[in-house]
Design a protein with these regions (language model features):
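P-loop/Walker A NTP-binding region and its immediately flanking N-terminal helices
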Residues: 11-211, 215-223
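Extreme N-terminal basic, low-complexity initiation segments
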Residues: 2-11
Length: 225
């Protein structure tokens, strides 16, 4: 899609779906992780080695290379489906894609990690990147809120990016409502759907996404890291 570099700040409908007082699953997990680090001074291995660029995404070179080529050629899709087992980098890849598209020095396949947009995305506080837990926000009302939010242009980034984890948990009614947005998305919108059970995602949704299958990471690849 063509980027939309600016939009009205503080539009009343922008944060209907994900207000700060009710973060999605990933938001709550991120807050808990950072609190644990502050209290104990210990950072789990998974957190210390969470990839921040496509080059750091171990075991998924086929995904990294294809997404890198798409960004370099300016052929970014409106919707992606990342499927595979838990803990193989689906959400990390979605965040890296978000940083790549909205980095102040991009779009780039190597986000700088230090600009305001990159930092806010990494800390899950970007106004233009929404991380949504499909298991907790699975009903048609939540998707209607999302569709309302989509109408507003980005606050200060090129793209508004919606990362929906466990998307297969959405109800049929929610899928049908989401389909209407996928059929004619605004040029500044990118969806990234993550799932451990791609077969449960409705074919009408899958057919409108670029599907990336994440492999189980081998022990030797983890040890090498």
């Amino acid at each position: 899609p063509s980027p939309n570099p600016s939009g009205p700040e503080g539009s009343s409908g922008r944060l209907v779906l994900m207000c700060s007082s009710q973060p999605g699953l990933w938001g709550r997990k991120r807050v808990h992780e950072e609190e644990q680090v502050q209290e104990t001074g210990f950072r789990a291995t998974a957190l210390r080695y969470r990839p921040q660029t496509f080059a750091g995404l171990i075991g998924q070179e086929h995904v990294s290379q294809t997404l890198t080529n798409a960004i370099k050629s300016g052929r970014v899709a409106h919707s992606y489906l990342f499927s595979g087992p838990r803990g193989v980098g689906k959400t990390s890849a979605a965040r890296i894609l978000a940083k790549s598209l909205n980095c102040e020095h991009g779009p780039t396949d190597t986000p700088c990690g230090v600009c305001t947009n990159c930092i806010e995305i990494a800390e899950s506080r970007s106004l233009d990147v929404f991380e949504i837990d499909g298991a907790s926000n699975r009903g048609i009302e939540q998707i209607r809120d999302l569709r309302e939010s989509v109408r507003f242009t980005p606050a200060r980034s090129r793209y508004k990016i919606y990362i929906i984890d466990e998307v297969h948990m959405l109800t049929n009614e929610a899928f049908n409502a989401l389909l209407k947005t996928l059929e004619e998305p605004p040029p500044y919108i990118v969806f990234v759907f993550a799932t451990t059970e791609a077969a449960k995602v409705k074919i009408t949704i899958r057919s409108r996404c670029q599907h990336y299958r994440f492999k189980r990471i081998q022990t030797r690849e983890i040890q090498a890291r």
